[in-house]
């Protein structure tokens, strides 16, 4: 009688990629209007009210997380805000 050898099951583990934080830093040369306008221009679904809240947070707390999400999109928004003249922290995983 042939013996049956159970086959090992392979575990499939899904790797979750981290989200990245786009952080704007306070500086002495960008105006409130410029920061808020850049946030509305480059960050998807950014409302005027939210842009101004974040701009105030940048000013009074020194920084604000303006967007969190997948690395590729975070890199794009980070680069766009940087090119617009905003002072940016390096991207960091959440």
From Swiss-Prot:
Coiled coil: none annotated. Pfam families: ClpS. Gene3D superfamilies: 3.30.1390.10. One of its GO terms (biological process) is protein catabolic process. InterPro entries: ClpS, ClpS_core, Ribosomal_bL12_C/ClpS-like. Binds to the N-terminal domain of the chaperone ClpA. PANTHER family: ATP-DEPENDENT CLP PROTEASE ADAPTER PROTEIN CLPS (PTHR33473:SF3), ATP-DEPENDENT CLP PROTEASE ADAPTER PROTEIN CLPS1, CHLOROPLASTIC (PTHR33473). Belongs to the ClpS family. Involved in the modulation of the specificity of the ClpAP-mediated ATP-dependent protein degradation. This is ATP-dependent Clp protease adapter protein ClpS. It comes from Thermosynechococcus vestitus (strain NIES-2133 / IAM M-273 / BP-1).
């Amino acid at each position: 009688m042939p013996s049956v050898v159970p086959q090992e099951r392979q575990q499939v583990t899904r790797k979750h990629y981290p989200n990245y934080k786009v952080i704007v830093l306070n500086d002495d040369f960008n105006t409130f209007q410029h920061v808020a306008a850049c946030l509305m221009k480059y960050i998807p679904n950014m409302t005027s009210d939210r842009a101004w809240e974040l701009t105030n947070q940048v000013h009074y707390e020194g920084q604000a997380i303006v967007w969190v999400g997948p690395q590729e999109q975070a890199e794009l928004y980070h680069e766009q805000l940087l090119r617009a003249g905003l002072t940016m922290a390096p991207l960091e995983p959440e």
